[in-house]
Structures are given as structure tokens and as C-alpha cells.
Amino acid sequence: MSSTNNRIPMPPRLRRQDGAVRRLGVELEMQGLDIDALSALVAEHVGGEIERVSQYEHVVRGDGAGDWQVELDFAYLKQRGRDADPDDSVLGQLDGAAEELLAAGSRMLVPMEIVTPPLPMNELDRLEALIDRLRDAGARG
């Protein structure tokens, strides 16, 4: 694929000194879609498979460019999700309830984020097509 008509401004040189195509990693932040919907959309778009790291963090694997991260843009909750260890004690249940309350509020205020792998600059039309699909699905931002 080549990006001759893309909306993303291109630098004057698309190749490095060694002749390889320069790459660009991108973070897209948005509201309007939950992590499951975003992950499914990204996986379908790139032909990948979803790996659920936690309820706040997914990885889409299988794209030749690398892994795509789909996550709630809140480091504290992502770490909590990774460290989750079921605790049936009263304090553990209280802690879990507090996390769920924080997560519910965060989903209304904190954006979801898609982090791309380093994409070849001459293939950024793939990213533009994904952005169009996200908008069509209800993403805002």
C-alpha cells in the first residue's frame, strides 16, 4: 500500500539513510467505545487476534508491523488489572468494590487509547482507514 493521498502530513524524506522506510508509532485517544468494541474493531482491521491482559488492557497480535495495544489510558487501573489476585476476605472484597467504582467513573472521564506498532510511513493509509472505521462505530476525540 502507498499513502499518496493521505491526510497525515509526510516528512520530506520517507526513507532512512540505510534506505529502509521510516516508521511511525501513533497513540489514538478517544471516547465512545469500550475496550471490547475497540479491540474487536482493531483485530478485524489488522487481521489479528485479541489477547486480554486485563479488563483495562488488551493486545491485538498478528499484524506484520507488530502488536497493537488497546487500553484505558489510566496507569493505576492498568497496573491493578495486571496485579489482580482474587481475595475473598472482607478487605479484598472492599478493595475490589473500590476498584470497580473507580473504573466506572474513569470510563466516563478517561479516554480509551489505541497504541500502534511502528508503522511504515508509506502504509499510513491503513491508519487513516482505521480512524474512519472508529468514527463510523461511534468513537469521538
Spans of model-derived segments:
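ATP/Mg2+-dependent ligation/transfer catalytic cores
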Residues: 2-140
